[in-house]
Amino acid sequence: MMEYKKIIAQNKKALFNYFIEERLEAGIVLKGSEVQSLRQGKASIEESHAADTGNEVFLYNCHIAEYEKANRFNHSTRRPRKLLLHKKEINKIIGRTKIKGYTLVALSMYFNKKNKIKIELGIAKGKKLHDKRESIKEKDWKRDQSRLIRQK
């Protein structure tokens, strides 16, 4: 059975720049104008990351465009947004990100089947330059293989 997800924004660069070791789903605290803007699909999580401050986790650098009809009640486009996670998940994140080289990256933002906005986070370790070259070679080889199969 496939789970319903209406994707709002994806961070495709994260899969290229990081080794994703674990994925988590988190809720996100938003204002009304932000929700309306997300319903129109006006969001970018390309440069966003999450970090812990005390016993809370916040999403930084996530761009949600202003909603035109919100007038003076509009939101700041790049404000830090609190993520909603269970205490055990927060403790796991804090423990893993304390290790050198690990970070918390936003992978995708979507509406779940109950129409709630969720964000998929990845506990990730950065790739070195040679790892990136290797993944490019792998991708090219798979593309060439599919071309050869189609030609036969």
From Swiss-Prot:
Primary site of residence: cytoplasm
Top-level taxon: Bacteria
Any single GO BP term: trans-translation
Compartment(s) where it occurs, according to its Swiss-Prot or TrEMBL record: Cytoplasm
The entry's keywords: Cytoplasm, RNA-binding
Pfam family, one: SmpB
Any one Gene Ontology molecular-function term assigned to this protein's record: RNA binding
Cited PANTHER family: SSRA-BINDING PROTEIN, TMRNA-BINDING COMPONENT OF TRANS-TRANSLATION TAGGING COMPLEX
Family stated for the protein in its record: Belongs to the SmpB family.
Name of this chain's protein: SsrA-binding protein
Species this chain originates from: Rickettsia bellii (strain RML369-C)
Record gene name: smpB
